[in-house]
Amino acid sequence: MKIYIPLVILIIGTLFFTSCSSDEESATTAAAAAGAAISTFNGTFNGTCAGANEKTDIVVISDTTAAETTMVYSDSECTTKSHANTLNYTVVSTTTATVDAKSVTKIEGTTTTSLSTIYTDSRVTNANEGSWCGISDWVKNTAKDVTGLTCSNLNETYGSAGVKKYDIWYLSGSTFMHSGFNSDGYSTSLDYSKTKE
């Protein structure tokens, strides 16, 4: 009987520590699978200048929000702004995946607002005279909420709020790569590369 008691204690102790170790490993695995915190991506990321009157993409990430801006410049050096459209999202990271041999974080975004901004006097005049997007009080450098609107003057249809979209993010140093938000699910490729300011 004296032999069995220490043996029972040893077995119980072994099972206890094995269980604790397993729980710690599970917690570590779950934390890794959850993906990087959004805050690790915070910053403004600029796409390559597309030239005069072409669309240059900018992404701004701040904790639980992300904004995708399509900026049009009037000069080839992309220094003089003409107009821009911005799609705003609330975002959460869901899990990790390997895409293009890189460990990416999967992002689920929910649309909040779509904004349109005009930066030149002549374009403001045209917008007000033509009531672009049904709006006739455009002001230079001031964003207008165009969420859910169809703007035939601009050949643009802006999405409604509350729409789920998906993206994948990768950050290495000052290089940010992503696929762009879309409602069809997570992309299997990193299609765009931007540089952090």
How would you describe each model-predicted region?
Residues 17-18, 42, 46, 177, ...:
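Compositionally biased, low-structure terminal segments
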Residues 51-52, 71-173, 182-188, 196:
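Contiguous, well-ordered beta-strand patches that form the walls/edges
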Residues 58-67, 168-177, 197:
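Short, solvent-exposed coil/turn segments at beta-strand boundaries
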